[in-house]
C-alpha cells in the first residue's frame, strides 16, 4: 500500500473520530431539548393498555418515523377540513407516541372545537359530547402520561374558560348549564367551607369508609334492598344515581335512605361518595379545591378576610383549577416561558370572568326545562386584584420590568371596578379602589399624566359615564335607559339586589346627564319623565316572552310584599298576571 493511501486512511479515521466526537457532545443538548418538549420521562409507563404497551415496545426505533408520517398526514387532513379522519390518525399517534404532548393538544382541540362545530347548533347535546370528549382526553389520558407538560394543562384550562365559559359557540349556554348541573349534584347549592372540609377529609377508599360501623350498616341495608348495589366497584355510582333518579331502583332502596336519614352512617357515606366521584370522575382533589377556595375565593364585602368557596358550577373555576395545577406541577418559576405566562393569564382571566359573571342561577321553567343565567359577583374583586398584582410582580422580574399587557389590563380592570362598586352603592370600596388606581397608574407609558385621575372619585365616575354616553341621541338614550331598567327588574326578580340598585343608579345619572346636556335645546331634545320611563320599562319586562314567566311572576310577588302601594297601582293594568299569581298561590299547599 502506498504512502499516499496511508495518509488518506489516517485522514478519514481522523474525520470519523471527529464526527463521533461532535455527535457525542450533541447528546446532552438533544436530551435536554427532548426533556423540555416532554418527549422523555424517567418513569416507565404504568397501567398502560395492551395496545399501547405492544406499540411502544414492538416498533422500537421505527416508531418515530411512523409518527412523523402520521403527524404530517393529520395536519394535512386538518387543513382540508377532514376532522374526523384527522381524529383517527391522532388516536394512532397517541398510542405510538404517548409522550408527544403536541398531539394530545391537537387531538383535544380537534374534538372540542373542530368536530363539535360540524354538528348543527340545534343539536347542542351532541355538540356537548364532543366538547366533553376533548377535555376528558387531556384530563384523563394526556396529562397522566405527560404530567410535566404545561401546554396540556393550559389547553385543558382553555377549553373550560373559552369553549365553555365564553360565548363564541352557539351552544355555550347549554354547555354552562350541563357543567353547573353536574357540579351541583355533587356539591349542592351554595356549598359552604364546611362542605369542602368534609369532602377533603373524606376516606380515600371504600374500605376506609366501610371501617365505620354505621356506614357499613347503611351499605348492607342498601345492598339487601336492591342487588344493583351488590357490585362494590359500582356502588358509589349507583348510590349517586339513586339520589338523583330513585325510580330506576327497587322501591325499598330509597326507603333505606329514609330509614337512615338521621344517622351518621348515611351522612358519612354520602360525603365519601361525592368526594370519590370528584376524585375519580372529575379527576380533581377535594383538598386542592379547598386550597383554591382559600386562595381565590370571593371575599365578604364587609370583611375582606372572610372568604367563601368559589362557585364550582362556573367553567372559569375549572379552568383556574387546571391552570394552577399545571403551574404547580409543570411550572418553572425561575424561567420565562410563553406557555407558562399564558397559563398564568388563564388564572387572572378566570378571576376576572368570575367578577363579571360569577353568580349562577338555575331555575326550572313551566315546561320542566332548566334555564341558566349568570350575573356579576363583586365579591371576587379582592381575589382578582391580589392575584393580578402578584402576576405583574412575577413578570416584572422575568421581563425586565416591562409586562405592559398585564399592567394595562389591570389598569382597565380597576377603572371598571370603580364604576361597578360606585353604581352598586358601595362608595367606600369604590373610593379605596380609585385611590389604588391613581397611585399605581398616575401616567401612561409616555409619561403623560392622566388628567381624569386628578378628579374626585365621584367626579371620575361621572366623567367615565359621560365619556361613554355623551354621544347618545334622543332615541339612543331612551333605548339605553329602557334596556338597563329592564335588566334591573330582572336582577331584582332573581334577588340580585345590589346589581338591581346599580342599574337604577346608572339610569338616574345618565338621565340627569342627558337632560342637563340638552337643557338649552328642550324644544328639540328631551326625554319623557323618569317615572314614565320606569313604568314603561316595567310593563315591557312583564310582557317580554324572552324572560321566563316564572321570573316575571317572581318580580310581581316581591313587589306585592315589599311595595304594596306600587302593587295596587299596577294591579289594574296587569290584571291577567295578578290573577295567574293568585291561582299559583292558591294551588300551593299550606305550610303545616
Whereabouts are the PLM-identified features?
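Aromatic-lined, polymer-binding surfaces characteristic
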Residues: 111, 127, 149-153
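Acidic helix/loop microenvironments that form the catalytic cleft of cell-wall polysaccharide enzymes
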Residues: 153-165
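N-terminal alpha-helical interaction modules that lie
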Residues: 1-106, 110, 114, 133-140, ...
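Substrate-binding clefts and substrate-entry loops adjacent to catalytic sites
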Residues: 111-124
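Non-membrane alpha-helical structural segments and their capping/turn regions in soluble enzymes
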Residues: 124-135
Amino acid at each position: 500500500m502506498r504512502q499516499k493511501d496511508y495518509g488518506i486512511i489516517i485522514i478519514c479515521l481522523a474525520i470519523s473520530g471527529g464526527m463521533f466526537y461532535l455527535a457525542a457532545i450533541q447528546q446532552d443538548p438533544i436530551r435536554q431539548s427532548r426533556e423540555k418538549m416532554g418527549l422523555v420521562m424517567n418513569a416507565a409507563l404504568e397501567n398502560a393498555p395492551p395496545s399501547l404497551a405492544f406499540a411502544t415496545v414492538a416498533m422500537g426505533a421505527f416508531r418515530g418515523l411512523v409518527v412523523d408520517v402520521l403527524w404530517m398526514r393529520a395536519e394535512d387532513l386538518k387543513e382540508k377540513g377532514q376532522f374526523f379522519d384527522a381524529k383517527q390518525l391522532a388516536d394512532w399517534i397517541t398510542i405510538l407516541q404517548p409522550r408527544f404532548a403536541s398531539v394530545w393538544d391537537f387531538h383535544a382541540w380537534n374534538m372540542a372545537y373542530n368536530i363539535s362545530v360540524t354538528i348543527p347548533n340545534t343539536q347542542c347535546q351532541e355538540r356537548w359530547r364532543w366538547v366533553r370528549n376533548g377535555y376528558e382526553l387531556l384530563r384523563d389520558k394526556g396529562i397522566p402520561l405527560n404530567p410535566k407538560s404545561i401546554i396540556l394543562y393550559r389547553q385543558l384550562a382553555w377549553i373550560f374558560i373559552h369553549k365553555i365559559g365564553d360565548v363564541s359557540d352557539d351552544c355555550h349556554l347549554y354547555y354552562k348549564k350541563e357543567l353547573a348541573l353536574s357540579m351541583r349534584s355533587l356539591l349542592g347549592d351554595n356549598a359552604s367551607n364546611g362542605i369542602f372540609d368534609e369532602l377533603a377529609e373524606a376516606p380515600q377508599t371504600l374500605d376506609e369508609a366501610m371501617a365505620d360501623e354505621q356506614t357499613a350498616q347503611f351499605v348492607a341495608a342498601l345492598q339487601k334492598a336492591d342487588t344493583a348495589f351488590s357490585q362494590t366497584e359500582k356502588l358509589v355510582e349507583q348510590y349517586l344515581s339513586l339520589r338523583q333518579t330513585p325510580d330506576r331502583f327497587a322501591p325499598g332502596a330509597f326507603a333505606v335512605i329514609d330509614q337512615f336519614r338521621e344517622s351518621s352512617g348515611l351522612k358519612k357515606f354520602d360525603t365519601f361518595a361525592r368526594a370519590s366521584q370528584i376524585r375519580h370522575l372529575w379527576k380533581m382533589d377535594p383538598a386542592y379545591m379547598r386550597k383554591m377556595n382559600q386562595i381565590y375565593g370571593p371575599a365578604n364585602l364587609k370583611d375582606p378576610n372572610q372568604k367563601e368557596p368559589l362557585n364550582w358550577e362556573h367553567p372559569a373555576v375549572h379552568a383556574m383549577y387546571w391552570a394552577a395545577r399545571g403551574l404547580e406541577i409543570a411550572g418553572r418559576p425561575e424561567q420565562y416561558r410563553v406557555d407558562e405566562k399564558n397559563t398564568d393569564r388563564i388564572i387572572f382571566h378566570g378571576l376576572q370572568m368570575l367578577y363579571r359573571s360569577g353568580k349562577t342561577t338555575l331555575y326550572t321553567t313551566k315546561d320542566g326545562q332548566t334555564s341558566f343565567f349568570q350575573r356579576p359577583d363583586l365579591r371576587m374583586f379582592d381575589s382578582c386584584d391580589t392575584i393580578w398584582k402578584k402576576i405583574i410582580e412575577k413578570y416584572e422580574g422575568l421581563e425586565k420590568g416591562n409586562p405592559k399587557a398585564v399592567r394595562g389590563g389591570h389598569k382597565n380592570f380597576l377603572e371598571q371596578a370603580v364604576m361597578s362598586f360606585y353604581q352598586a352603592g358601595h362608595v367606600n370600596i369604590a373610593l379605596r379602589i380609585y385611590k389604588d388606581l391613581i397611585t399605581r397608574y398616575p401616567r401612561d407609558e409616555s409619561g403623560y399624566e392622566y388628567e381624569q385621575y386628578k378628579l374626585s372619585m365621584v367626579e371620575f365616575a361621572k366623567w367615565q359615564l359621560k365619556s361613554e354616553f355623551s354621544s347618545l341621541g334622543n332615541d339612543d338614550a331612551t333605548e339605553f335607559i329602557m334596556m338597563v331598567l329592564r335588566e334591573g327588574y330582572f336582577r331584582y326578580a332573581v334577588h340580585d339586589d345590589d346589581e338591581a340598585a346599580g342599574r337604577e343608579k346608572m339610569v338616574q345619572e345618565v338621565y340627569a346627564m342627558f337632560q342637563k346636556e340638552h337643557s338649552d335645546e328642550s324644544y328639540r331634545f328631551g326625554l319623557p319623565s323618569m317615572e314614565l320611563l320606569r313604568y314603561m320599562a316595567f310593563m315591557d319586562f312583564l310582557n317580554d316572552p324572552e324572560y321566563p314567566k316564572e321570573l316575571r311572576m317572581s318580580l310581581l310577588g316581591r313587589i306585592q310584599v315589599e311595595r304594596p302601594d306600587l302593587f295596587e297601582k299596577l294591579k289594574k293594568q296587569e290584571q291577567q298576571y295578578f290573577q295567574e299569581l293568585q291561582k299559583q298561590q292558591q294551588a300551593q299547599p299550606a305550610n303545616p
